[in-house]
From Swiss-Prot:
Name of the protein: Uncharacterized protein ORF72
Domain of life: Viruses
Length: 72
């Protein structure tokens, strides 16, 4: 999981992106912001948001990267 901080209307919004190794792979977004900031981007039952696509690619790279093994 990667975490990025964005400035939205002068307030900090944290977006956590995780790629699940399910079949097919799934992308999970967790958006952390205060209620007032979030309410500006919710229309009825729809949440609209945009993030840098490079951040999604970073999450994919992190998931696919070989894990380092520590040896004694």
């Amino acid at each position: 999981m990667i975490e990025r901080k964005y400035d939205v209307d002068g307030k900090e919004v944290i977006v956590k992106i995780e790629i699940l190794g399910a079949v097919p792979p799934q992308v999970v977004f967790e958006i952390v912001a205060d209620k007032d900031t979030l309410s500006k981007y919710i229309d009825g039952n729809t949440l609209s948001f945009a993030i840098d696509i490079d951040d999604i690619f970073d999450a994919i790279r992190e998931t696919l990267a070989p894990k380092k093994v520590l040896r004694d």
